[in-house]
Amino acid sequence: MSRIGNKTITLPADVTVSQEGAVVTVKGPKGELSREIVSAITMTVEGNEVSFSRDSDDSKTRALHGTTRANVANMVEGVSEGFTKTLKLVGVGYRAAKSGSKLTLSVGYSHPVDFEDREELSVEVPDALTIKVSGISKQKVGDLAAEIRAVRSPEPYKGKGIRYEGEVVRRKEGKTGK
C-alpha cells in the first residue's frame, strides 16, 4: 500500500489537469508541463481533486504508484507557484556574473566557467555571491542547480565552494603537526 500514492492532489483554482492516453498535461498561470505515466497507474480527475490507483500489485507498479503521484503533484505546484533553488558562493575571490544569456562563475580555476541559459529556466544573480535558479519544472531546476554546484562543491576543511542556501557542510579538522 502506497501512502503517498493514495493521497489526493487538490488543484488550485487556476490549474487544469488533463490526460490523453499515457500523457498527463498540467496547465496553469506560469505555463504548461507534460509527462508520460505508466499504463498500470490510473489517474482520475473529479472536480478539483486528482487521485491515482494501480491495476496490479506487483513490486514495480507499487513502486511507481507513489512516484507518479509525487511527479504530478510537483507539476501542479510548478505551474501554479514555480520552484526556486538558491546557491551561495563561499570563498575568497569567488563570484558569479550574468551577462545576457550567460552565467559566468569565477571559482578559483585558471579560467571562468560558463553556463548558457536553458529553456523554461531563469537564472538570476542578485549579488556576486548568490545565484537563483527558477522555473516550473522541479527536475530541471534541481538539475541545473546541481550542475552549477558540481563546478566547485564545498570542501570539508575550509568550507569553500558553491553550496545550496541552508546547506550545512560537515567540517573536518586539519592535520595536527608533530
Curated annotation (Swiss-Prot):
This protein binds to the 23S rRNA, and is important in its secondary structure. It is located near the subunit interface in the base of the L7/L12 stalk, and near the tRNA binding site of the peptidyltransferase center. It comes from Leuconostoc mesenteroides subsp. mesenteroides (strain ATCC 8293 / DSM 20343 / BCRC 11652 / CCM 1803 / JCM 6124 / NCDO 523 / NBRC 100496 / NCIMB 8023 / NCTC 12954 / NRRL B-1118 / 37Y). One of its GO terms (cellular component) is cytosolic large ribosomal subunit. One of its GO terms (biological process) is cytoplasmic translation. Belongs to the universal ribosomal protein uL6 family. It comes from the Bacteria. The gene is rplF. The keyword RNA-binding applies. InterPro entries: Ribosomal_uL6-like, Ribosomal_uL6-like_a/b-dom_sf, Ribosomal_uL6_a/b-dom, Ribosomal_uL6_bac-type, Ribosomal_uL6_CS. Part of the 50S ribosomal subunit. Keywords: Ribonucleoprotein, Ribosomal protein, RNA-binding, rRNA-binding. This is Large ribosomal subunit protein uL6. Gene3D superfamilies: Ribosomal protein L6, alpha-beta domain. One of its GO terms (molecular function) is structural constituent of ribosome. NCBIfam families: L6_bact.
